[in-house]
C-alpha cells in the first residue's frame, strides 16, 4: 500500500442521526507511510507536531471558531441551488428564520457527538447561519470542524436543504467566513495580555499578529 490510516481512538463518536440498531461510529485517522513514519504533509500531523513543539516551550494554544454556512433549496431533481425563499437577517428568529429548525437539529446532533456548542444564530444574509464552538485545544477544535461540516451537510439534507460553506455563493449578499479566536497560555496565564501596554497587548501578541500578517 502507498499509505496507512491509523485510527485515533480519542475521536471515536457514535453518529446520532443513524439508526440505533446497527450503530455507526466515526473515527478520524492519522496518515502513515509504509515504513511506519507519519506522513509529513498530512495537515493533521503538521498541526499535532506544531502543538507538541509549542508545548515543549510551555505554551498551549486555545481556539474557538465561528462557523458560517448557507442553507439553500435543491431543485426538483435534488440538485443543489443557491435559491432561498427566506428574507431573514442577522439574529432573526422564526417565523422569519426558515432554517431555525434545521440549525437547531444540527446543534443537538453536534452535542450528542460530544462537540460543545456555545451559541448559534442566523447570520446577515438570507439563509446564512452561524454555529460557534466552545474554545478548546487547537487540534481538538480542528477535528471538530471536520465533523461539524459532515454533520451540517447530513442534517441539512434531512431537512430537504443543501448546505454550502462556499465563501461567496451569491454575489449580491454577504459571504461566509470562519473567524477563529486565538489565545496562547503559559503557566495558566494568557501571554497575549499585557495590562501595562495602552492596547493591553504583550510582545508575544505583536509577534503573533506579525506572523499572521506575513502568512497572508
Where are these regions (language model features)?
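Glycine-rich, acidic/polar active-site loops that bind/position phosphate-bearing ligands
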Residues: 1-214
Amino acid at each position: 500500500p502507498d499509505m496507512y490510516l491509523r485510527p485515533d481512538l480519542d475521536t471515536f463518536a457514535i453518529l446520532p442521526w443513524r439508526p440505533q440498531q446497527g450503530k455507526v461510529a466515526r473515527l478520524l485517522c492519522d496518515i502513515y507511510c509504509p515504513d511506519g513514519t507519519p506522513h509529513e504533509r498530512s495537515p493533521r500531523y503538521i498541526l499535532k507536531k506544531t502543538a507538541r513543539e509549542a508545548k515543549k516551550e510551555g505554551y498551549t494554544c486555545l481556539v474557538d471558531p465561528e462557523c458560517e454556512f448557507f442553507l439553500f433549496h435543491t431543485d426538483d431533481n435534488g440538485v443543489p441551488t443557491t435559491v432561498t425563499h427566506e428574507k431573514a437577517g442577522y439574529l432573526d428568529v422564526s417565523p422569519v428564520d426558515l432554517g431555525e429548525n434545521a440549525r437547531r437539529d444540527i446543534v443537538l446532533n453536534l452535542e450528542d457527538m460530544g462537540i460543545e456548542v456555545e451559541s448559534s444564530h442566523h447570520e446577515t444574509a438570507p439563509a446564512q447561519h452561524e454555529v460557534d464552538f466552545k474554545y478548546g485545544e487547537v487540534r481538538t477544535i480542528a477535528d471538530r470542524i471536520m465533523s461539524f461540516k459532515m454533520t451540517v451537510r447530513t442534517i441539512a439534507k434531512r431537512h430537504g436543504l443543501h448546505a454550502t460553506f462556499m465563501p461567496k455563493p451569491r454575489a449580491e449578499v454577504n459571504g461566509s467566513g470562519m473567524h477563529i479566536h486565538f489565545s496562547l497560555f503559559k503557566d495558566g496565564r494568557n501571554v497575549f495580555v499585557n495590562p501595562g501596554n495602552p492596547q493591553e497587548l504583550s510582545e508575544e501578541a505583536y509577534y503573533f499578529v506579525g506572523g499572521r500578517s506575513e502568512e497572508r
